[in-house]
Amino acid sequence: MLDKLFGNETLAMIFLNLFHYEEVYSGLIEKNTGTGSRAVLNQLNKMEEAGILVSREVGRTRLYQFNPKSPFIKPIKEIINITYSNMSIKLKEKMFKERMRPRAKGKEVIK
């Protein structure tokens, strides 16, 4: 559904990954979606140039996140939240395989 709204499946998957993790590197998106690195980097660069995303370097890794100063972020996040909240836990576990930090014992796997 998001691919039809945003006009691009790669962009839709990038937005879902950003919504889930809040901050991601391109390799994680590639791993989670099975999309090629060139396609992911092209979309990330376009969104950064448009002011939708911002990035920072940590060592040799570039981390991307939504630009909190952009007026478009709130409506974009609301659209993504509708899709994300309607996804089953199994689908979320399948799509977002990598954990960003350890989970406390007894805590839910997906928010």
What positions do the PLM features span?
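Short, cationic-aromatic polyanion-contact patches
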Residues: 1-11, 25, 58-80
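Short capping segments at the starts of secondary-structure elements
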Residues: 19-25
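Short, hydrophobic-biased segments on the C-terminal half of alpha helices
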Residues: 44-45
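A short, conserved structural fragment
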Residues: 48-58
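Key DNA-contact positions within bacterial/archaeal DNA-binding proteins
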Residues: 38
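Pre-recognition alpha-helix immediately N-terminal to the DNA-recognition helix
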Residues: 12-16
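A short acidic, leucine-rich amphipathic alpha-helix
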Residues: 28-32
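Amphipathic alpha-helical dimerization/coiled-coil segments
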Residues: 71-111
